[in-house]
UniProtKB/Swiss-Prot annotation:
Residue stretches spanning the membrane: none
Record-listed heme c binding positions: R12, Q13, T69, E70, C119, C122, H123
Database matches in Pfam families: Cytochrom_C_2 (PF01322)
Any one GO MF annotation of this record: heme binding
Gene Ontology CC terms: periplasmic space
Name the record gives this protein: Cytochrome c'
Task of the protein: Cytochrome c' is the most widely occurring bacterial c-type cytochrome. Cytochromes c' are high-spin proteins and the heme has no sixth ligand. Their exact function is not known.
Amino acid sequence: QFQKPGDAIEYRQSAFTLIANHFGRVAAMAQGKAPFDAKVAAENIALVSTLSKLPLTAFGPGTDKGHGTEAKPAVWSDAAGFKAAADKFAAAVDKLDAAGKTGDFAQIKAAVGETGGACKGCHDKFKEK
């Protein structure tokens, strides 16, 4: 899929940047830092849902060093733990996507909290600060 390990690292970093940007817009609404707009929330959640499937394909062999990677060695040394964290993130994003489709603020807010927790759980163990 990727010509060089550096291409994979840049790909996953770009995908995570986009996810964080679109998730952040919804999180700001959930935290009361931005006015809630169900349509805007749904649009951003749909993007998070689509984008969330991209970066995890880019943690292949040779992508553990260089190109500004912030992935900890545990991504590869604890592959089962990393997969479990990725699965938890995917499940949380699925719930977020379902909540976004309802347009209900309370459901979106709860799903944002769960998704944010899944992000943090993975970052704490598998990402350099």
